[in-house]
């Protein structure tokens, strides 16, 4: 196996894999905390990095039928949640391309503030 290249999304509040601490996303990408996964509470994010994706699966969920892929950590292969590929109901289309991370499988921590130098420095 070759080298694994990981991305870093930056931000002041970071979400990382609970198993290996690989950075996945930040607080500014959070859309909703009102989701439920197999392990309990789950969060919907706009952009998540450092993921591996399973094959597409047809699942019937509480909100209807969806085409989804399970997502796991690119670094350690731990399951983290899923990504919505397609929603059959118009009211659920906002989820398409968005990622669910299960709260029990990720860790939230302090990130860092990026200071961009000004012309006066």
Swiss-Prot record:
Q: Which residues are modified to Phosphoserine? A: 118
Residues in Yippee domain copies: 13-110
Q: Which residues bind Zn(2+)?
A: 17, 20, 73, 76
Q: Which GO terms describe its biological process?
A: cell population proliferation
Which Pfam families does its entry note? Yippee-Mis18
Q: Does the keyword Iron-sulfur apply?
A: no
Reading the lineage from the top rank, the first entry is Eukaryota
- Among the entry's GO cellular component annotations, what is one? midbody
* UniProt entry keywords in alphabetical sequence: Cytoplasm, Cytoskeleton, Metal-binding, Nucleus, Phosphoprotein, Zinc
Q: Which GO terms describe its molecular function?
A: metal ion binding
**Cross-referenced InterPro entries:** Yippee (IPR034751), Yippee/Mis18/Cereblon (IPR004910), Yippee_fam (IPR039058)
Q: Which PROSITE patterns match?
A: YIPPEE
Q: Does the keyword Zinc apply?
A: yes
Question: Where is this gene product found?
Answer: Nucleus; Cytoplasm, Cytoskeleton, Microtubule organizing center, Centrosome; Cytoplasm, Cytoskeleton, Spindle pole; Midbody
Principal localisation? nucleus
Subunit structure of this chain's protein: Identified in the CTLH complex that contains GID4, RANBP9 and/or RANBP10, MKLN1, MAEA, RMND5A (or alternatively its paralog RMND5B), GID8, ARMC8, WDR26 and YPEL5. Within this complex, MAEA, RMND5A (or alternatively its paralog RMND5B), GID8, WDR26, and RANBP9 and/or RANBP10 form the catalytic core, while GID4, MKLN1, ARMC8 and YPEL5 have ancillary roles. Interacts with RANBP9 and RANBP10.
Which family, according to UniProt?
Belongs to the yippee family.
Q: What does this protein do?
A: Component of the CTLH E3 ubiquitin-protein ligase complex that selectively accepts ubiquitin from UBE2H and mediates ubiquitination and subsequent proteasomal degradation of the transcription factor HBP1. Required for normal cell proliferation.
Q: What name has this protein been given in UniProt?
A: Protein yippee-like 5
